[in-house]
Design a protein with these regions (language model features):
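Flexible hinge motifs at transmembrane-helix junctions and intramembrane kinks/re-entrant loops
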Residues: 1, 17-28, 190-205
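Hydrophobic alpha-helical transmembrane segments
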Residues: 2-25, 51-72, 162-185
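Helix-loop-helix
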Residues: 4, 31-38, 184, 188-195
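Hydrophobic alpha-helical segments of membrane proteins
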Residues: 7, 11, 19, 26-29, ...
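Transmembrane alpha-helix interface/packing and boundary motifs in multi-pass membrane proteins
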Residues: 11-24, 33-36, 100-103, 108
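Pore- and pathway-forming membrane helices of multi-pass small-molecule/ion transporters and channels
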Residues: 29-38, 69-76, 97-103, 144-165
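Helix-loop-helix junctions within the multi-pass membrane cores of secondary transporters/permeases
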Residues: 38-121, 125, 129
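Transmembrane alpha-helical segments and their short flanking loops
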Residues: 43-49, 110-207
Length: 207
């Protein structure tokens, strides 16, 4: 349970997703062996009277839900709506993708846009996963985000999960929106390049 291994796991997960593979499931086959035990230990410690900030482990199964998709697929979804005037086909796709995205079901965005194998979006996708993952781990380690001791369903909307899983951590909800804002900034120039290329393609190659 350390920030360097966690950040590496987030990087590898994003890299696998870009290649069309389920990065969470693949890396989780190794890490879940540890993180499931760690959240159980956190729960045991909490029930014994340990304060949330003093729980033994930062890295728990759902820690990534506070960063990875809210900093990548949520910004992509927003930009899909924003670009729908220039690229009309994006609006119905974004509308379909919105309800599942609220519950961290991101396959419609990953394979529908697609983000997978997308040369314009692969760099910010990997970057946001990695940076916000490390940032969230650090904020949890210093106590801004409460350490999780309840293993809620993975599809719980991220702000709610961050708040409830640590027994009412306001920081756990706030960090979701911070990571979303970070993702919006990182994705912006890459999305504009993607939008320009798609408009040119739609216009038959004209600039």
């Amino acid at each position: 349970d350390n920030i360097f291994i966690y950040t590496l796991q987030q990087f590898l997960s994003a890299l696998l997703w870009i290649c069309g593979l389920h990065g969470d499931n693949i890396t989780g086959a190794v890490t879940n062996v540890f993180t499931n035990q760690w959240i159980a230990d956190n729960n045991t410690a909490f029930m014994a009277g340990t304060a949330v900030k003093d729980l033994p482990y930062v890295w728990t199964p759902n820690l990534c839900r506070l960063s990875q998709w809210v900093s990548s697929c949520w910004p992509i979804l927003v930009y899909m709506f924003m670009s729908s005037k220039k690229l009309p086909h994006l609006k119905p796709l974004a509308t379909i993708c919105l309800p599942p995205a609220v519950f961290c079901i991101i396959e419609p965005i990953m394979f529908g846009l697609p983000v997978v194998m997308n040369g314009f979006l692969l760099v910010p996708f990997i970057l946001t996963h990695t940076l916000t993952g490390a940032f969230t781990y650090w904020l949890t380690s210093i106590g801004f985000v409460g350490k999780m001791y309840m293993n809620l369903p993975w599809a719980t909307p991220s702000p709610i999960l961050g708040y409830l899983a640590a027994g009412g951590s306001i920081g756990g909800a706030v960090v979701v929106f911070i990571n979303f804002a970070i993702g919006m900034v990182i994705f912006y120039p890459f999305w504009k390049s993607y939008e320009k290329a798609e408009v040119a393609k739609m216009n038959g190659g004209a600039a």
